[in-house]
A protein has these predicted regions:
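Signals and flexible motifs at protein termini associated with secretion
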Residues: 1, 6-19, 24-26, 119-146
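N-terminal accessory interaction module
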Residues: 55-140
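Cysteine-cluster motifs in flexible loop/terminal segments that predominantly coordinate metals
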Residues: 182-225
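A broadly conserved sequence feature marking short terminus-proximal activation segments
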Residues: 132-195, 205
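Long, charge-rich boundary regions
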Residues: 227-230
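Charged, amphipathic alpha-helical stretches
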Residues: 1-64
Length: 230
């Protein structure tokens, strides 16, 4: 599947000018998952991160890794803008319906991810992801490497997931508005997949999906395939 590849390229290019720290995936060095939602009160909070979080799926090769662009959790002294982007290699299903269902299932992984002292709040409608990190977690050595290890482990519980690169961004110089736009576009592409499965319009000029098909490589081919147009 190539429909998200242009977004992966844009994110990578946006991060290119900034210094990065890259870690290999070490499952045994994962932060503890407490298995349930936590409430971290303001008085218990050391750092608040506010920004976006989204996943970009591809059939291209992705090596398991964690990349930190900017300061890590142990280095942050004040609240920060934030982004969490995952590049995910997966084996797409044999038809569009099953592939869409698989994408949604992979997306739902974030609702089963509960790092100790790391409270995640998401808004799918607003494409937002914010985090509260507790004083205790910081004291106990939490960092993005350990959080990323846990997240990759969660994704790879799904046998269709073959590789995951997690990118955490706190660098203040990054254009977070562009990341927000890419997150929004990612959501639009995913929702368009759902529409494609139910849209049997054969005329590109009158189809309400034309704008997305024109912009996203591979989307028109999926639409025609779904419509059984040769």
């Amino acid at each position: 599947m190539e429909i998200f590849d242009s977004l992966i390229k844009e994110v990578s290019e946006l991060m290119e000018p900034y210094s990065k720290t890259e870690y290999s995936f070490e499952k045994e060095n994962s932060w503890e998952d407490v298995g349930h939602n936590q409430v971290i009160l303001q008085k218990e909070t050391k750092i608040e991160l506010d920004g976006v979080g989204f996943n970009l799926l591809t059939s291209s090769n992705i090596d398991d890794s964690i990349v930190v662009v900017g300061k890590d959790l142990q280095e942050l002294k004040e609240n920060s803008k934030f982004a969490r982007i995952c590049f995910i290699e997966f084996c797409e299903a044999e038809d569009i319906q099953k592939t869409y269902n698989l994408i949604r299932k992979i997306e739902y992984t974030k609702y089963h991810f509960f790092p100790d002292g790391y409270m995640i709040r998401t808004s799918s409608k607003a494409h937002k992801e914010s985090v509260r990190v507790s004083k205790t977690a910081v004291k106990n050595g939490v960092d993005f490497h350990k959080i990323g290890n846990l997240l990759i482990s969660k994704f790879k519980e799904n046998p269709a997931v073959k590789g995951v690169k997690v990118v955490f961004v706190t660098e203040a110089a990054v254009d977070f508005s562009k990341l927000e736009n890419l997150s929004r576009k990612n959501h639009e592409i995913t929702e368009t997949l759902n529409q494609v499965m139910n849209n049997l319009t054969f005329d590109c000029d009158t189809c309400n999906l034309k704008a997305i098909c024109d912009e996203v490589e591979g989307m028109r081919e999926l639409h025609f395939k779904s419509s059984r147009v040769k």
